[in-house]
Each structure stands twice: as structure tokens, then as C-alpha cells.
């Protein structure tokens, strides 16, 4: 996208190369799959953006349980979707951030922060 294209906003986060080299992306179906991890192998942070809108409430609840199972106790999950809490998952919503974007019209992004409690 060209710099300054009308109707688009560019946002970026600078991450140190040493941190980037330690990131291990995992491609999986979050509704039906989870990694079997020992407690010391679980993640401190999982980020899932723009994926839950493709699933209904039941599937989102299953995904929430799977995410919790892959987090260390006290670990965090960030998503731009508010997930239903219809099934006990061990995740509690601890924060939501509103990020307004301006342009031709104002759009607000939401970042939901969940923490594993168990």
C-alpha cells in the first residue's frame, strides 16, 4: 500500500531483532487443535487477531479453552475479538483497550487482554 493512501492508516510496532529471533509462529486450527505442552513449555503470551470472527460462539468457546491450555498460569492472550465465556476456560478478561483510527471515518479497534487464572 502506498504511504499516505487515502482511507488507510499505517501502524507499526518496533521489535528488537533479538526478540524476533525467539518468536516461533505456529499454524494450527485453534478450535480443534492444541499443542500438548508440559507446564514449563507453555506460552507466556499468545496473540490471535482477526481469526475468531470466522467462528460462532460455540467454536469461540472451544478456542478459548484451547488457548488457556497452552498458556502458563498467569500468561496472557491478546485478541481483537471479545470471546464468550459460556464454558469455563481458566481465562479471565483483565483489560480492554480502545484504539481509535482516524481517516475518512473514525474506526475503533479493540484489544482484549485475557489472563490465565489456573
Residue ranges and their predicted role:
Residues 1-12, 88-117:
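Conserved Class I S-adenosyl-L-methionine
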Residues 60-73:
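A short glycine-rich, Lys/Arg-flanked "PGG" loop and its adjoining helix->strand segment in the class I
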Residues 17, 58-61, 105:
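Conserved phosphate-coordination/catalytic loops
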Residues 43-58:
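A short SAM/SAH-binding and catalytic strip from SAM-dependent methyltransferases
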Residues 45-47, 71-83:
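Conserved beta-strand signature within the Rossmann-like core of class I S-adenosyl-L-methionine
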Residues 31-32, 82-86:
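Short "lid" loop at the C-terminus of a central beta-strand within the Rossmann-like core
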Residues 1-38:
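Extended basic-aromatic, gly/pro-enriched interface segments that bind polyanionic ligands
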Residues 39, 59-63, 90:
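Residues at alpha-helix caps and immediate loop-helix transition turns in enzyme cores, especially N-
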Amino acid at each position: 500500500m502506498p504511504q499516505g493512501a487515502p482511507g488507510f492508516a499505517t501502524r507499526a510496532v518496533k521489535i528488537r531483532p533479538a526478540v524476533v529471533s525467539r518468536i516461533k509462529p505456529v499454524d494450527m486450527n485453534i478450535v480443534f487443535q492444541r499443542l500438548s505442552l508440559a507446564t514449563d513449555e507453555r506460552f507466556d503470551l499468545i496473540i490471535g487477531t482477526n481469526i475468531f470472527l470466522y467462528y460462532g460462539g460455540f467454536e469461540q468457546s472451544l478456542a478459548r479453552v484451547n488457548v488457556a491450555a497452552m498458556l502458563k498460569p498467569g500468561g496472557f492472550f491478546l485478541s481483537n475479538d471479545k470471546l464468550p465465556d459460556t464454558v469455563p476456560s481458566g481465562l479471565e478478561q483483565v483489560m480492554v483497550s480502545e484504539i481509535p483510527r482516524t481517516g475518512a471515518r473514525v474506526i475503533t479497534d479493540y484489544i482484549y487482554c485475557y489472563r490465565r487464572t489456573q
